[in-house]
């Protein structure tokens, strides 16, 4: 190999080595620049985070701390909350929950009767001096007044619907001005088509009482019979009778008053219209009730009434008492007269010779015999209805009540209260017979019980023949 060739080979090797070194330096420089870019990027990220953190700190410092945490002495403490105090209602003239439909006087009467705990809804004072009313007692609610907000309606038209009944009574209440607030006073109607009666539920106790003024109103040709339900318990201090009179409506309930008349000795064949015609010859009637046998529907021979104009009461007594109707003579007097003016006959040895007598108001120096010839058996009338004797428990309660009261006048030997039987005409059903051990005790009981009230009805009494009583001949 010539020297030239050798020289050229060395040049090529040197060139290859330089190229190799150059490539190595380029790769190293590229990696270095990449690392530099990454370092610069991380540095920018740190600066951005620091800036955001500083910005948050500035925002925190720029507004007051209401909640959250702040750094103090190396610990975290809660900043106090600043909230607006709630306004406490004083409940001035605001009815308690569940009593929206009764008046304040009714509420006070219920509270006085112990139906509402006296301290149950009294406001208590907080340390800040605010009155706070506690949660009402769970038992307090409209259910407590429900029985006082319901009415029984009998003799309803056949096939009548609940909607029609509700519309009729709501309209009558509005026309009569008996509603206490806008809206319908009748909330619900329940009809028993088989037994031809219904129950109405009103929104308030007062409106329920005023609706009783429609007793006897004509609805689709039927005279409605309106009564309180059997479970009714009067509210203390509240009137049980309506304070209004609906013109043209003759109530079938004659409330107790000084102007309530008893008409006895009516022939059994006379119907309501015939007796009314006789009575209205002295003036229009406010209320009238001809007592009938529930089994036969026939008159029992006596009735009660009250006139619209109370001034004609004495005139009716003077004109009707002693009037001959067929083979009977009328006995007309105030219904409560027996309890006040009956004279106790004594001593016992003269009982059979001296009948109980009373002075009838409105008659000129005349006396009428009360209750017939005295015996040991007393008949109490107008105290119970046949349907009230169906339930065994209720029947036993009535017997016990009668026994307890009659025992105050003497020793009670026996009591008979005939009960209704389906499909059978039971003699004396609706009457109560009490046998005493002596005539004298029976007389005392008559004088003490005549004109008294039993189940909100005025008691009428008469003597019963002992032999008929023992034969159970209660006709």
Swiss-Prot record:
Basic residues composition bias: residue spans: 23-46, 79-89
Post-translational modification: Lysyl-hydroxylation at Lys-15 and Lys-276 affects the mRNA splicing activity of the protein, leading to regulate some, but not all, alternative splicing events.
Family annotation (PANTHER family): RNA-BINDING PROTEIN
Gene name as annotated: U2AF2
Family of this protein: Belongs to the splicing factor SR family.
One Pfam short name: RRM_1
Self-association state and partner proteins as the record states: Interacts with U2AF1L4. Heterodimer with U2AF1. Binds unphosphorylated SF1. Interacts with SCAF11 and SNW1. Interacts with ZRSR2/U2AF1-RS2. Interacts with RBM17. Interacts with PRPF19; the interaction is direct. Interacts with POLR2A (via the C-terminal domain); recruits PRPF19 and the Prp19 complex to the pre-mRNA. Interacts with KHDC4 (Isoform 2). Interacts with ZRSR2. Interacts with the SF3B complex composed of SF3B1, SF3B2, SF3B3, SF3B4, SF3B5, SF3B6 and PHF5A.
Residue numbers bearing the N-acetylserine modification: 2
Region (Necessary and sufficient to stimulate pre-mRNAs 3'-end cleavage in a CFIm complex-dependent manner): 17-47
Gene3D superfamilies named among the record's database cross-references: 3.30.70.330
Organism (species): Homo sapiens (Human)
Covalent link location (Glycyl lysine isopeptide (Lys-Gly) (interchain with G-Cter in SUMO2)): 15, 70
Keyword Methyltransferase tagged: no
Main location, first listed in the record: nucleus
Entry-linked SUPFAM superfamilies: RNA-binding domain, RBD
A single BP term in Gene Ontology: mRNA splicing, via spliceosome
Residues that bear N6-acetyllysine: 70
Any one annotated GO CC term: commitment complex
PROSITE patterns per the UniProt record, alphabetical: RRM (PS50102)
Name the record gives this protein: Splicing factor U2AF 65 kDa subunit
Residues annotated with 5-hydroxylysine modification: 15, 276
């Amino acid at each position: 190999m010539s020297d030239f060739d050798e020289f050229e080979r060395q040049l090529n090797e040197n060139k290859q080595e330089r190229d190799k070194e150059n490539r190595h330096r380029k790769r190293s420089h590229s990696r270095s620049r990449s690392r530099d870019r990454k370092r610069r990027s991380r540095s920018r990220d740190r600066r951005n985070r620091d800036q955001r953190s500083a910005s948050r700190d500035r925002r925190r410092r720029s507004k007051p701390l209401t909640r959250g945490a702040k750094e103090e002495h190396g610990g975290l403490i809660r900043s106090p909350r600043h909230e607006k105090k709630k306004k406490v209602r004083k409940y001035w003239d605001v009815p308690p929950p569940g009593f929206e439909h009764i008046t304040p006087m009714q509420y006070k009467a219920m509270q006085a009767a112990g139906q509402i705990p006296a301290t149950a809804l009294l406001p208590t004072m907080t340390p800040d001096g605010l009155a706070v009313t506690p949660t009402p007692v769970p038992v307090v609610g409209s259910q407590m007044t429900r029985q006082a907000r319901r009415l029984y309606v009998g003799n309803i038209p056949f096939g009548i619907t609940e909607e029609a009944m509700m519309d009729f009574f709501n309209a009558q209440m509005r026309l009569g001005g008996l509603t206490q607030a806008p809206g319908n006073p009748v909330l619900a109607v329940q009809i028993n088509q088989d037994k031809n009666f219904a129950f109405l539920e009103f929104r308030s106790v007062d409106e329920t009482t005023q609706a009783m003024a429609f007793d006897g109103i004509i609805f689709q040709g039927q005279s409605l019979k309106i009564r309180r339900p059997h479970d009714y318990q009067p509210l203390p201090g509240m009137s049980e009778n309506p304070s209004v009179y609906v013109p043209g409506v003759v109530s079938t309930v004659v409330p107790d008053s000084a102007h309530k008349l008893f008409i006895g000795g009516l022939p059994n064949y006379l119907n309501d219209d015939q007796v009314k015609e006789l009575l209205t010859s002295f003036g229009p009637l406010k209320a009238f009730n001809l007592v009938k046998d529930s089994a036969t529907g026939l008159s029992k021979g006596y009735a009660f009434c009250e006139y619209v104009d109370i001034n004609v009461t004495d005139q009716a007594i003077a004109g009707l008492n002693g009037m001959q109707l067929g083979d009977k003579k009328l006995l007309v007097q105030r219904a409560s007269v027996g309890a006040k003016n009956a004279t106790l006959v004594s001593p016992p040895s003269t009982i059979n010779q001296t009948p109980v007598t009373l002075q009838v108001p409105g008659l000129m120096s005349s006396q009428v015999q009360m209750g017939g010839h005295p015996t040991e058996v007393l008949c109490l009338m107008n105290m119970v209805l046949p349907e009230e004797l169906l339930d065994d428990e209720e029947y036993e309660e009535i017997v016990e009540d009668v026994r307890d009261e009659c025992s105050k006048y003497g020793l009670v030997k026996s009591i008979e209260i005939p009960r209704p039987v389906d499909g059978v005409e039971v003699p004396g059903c609706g009457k109560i017979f009490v046998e005493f051990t002596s005539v004298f005790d029976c007389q005392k009981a008559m004088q003490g019980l005549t004109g008294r009230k039993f189940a909100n009805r005025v008691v009428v009494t008469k003597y019963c023949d002992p032999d008929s009583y023992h034969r159970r001949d209660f006709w």
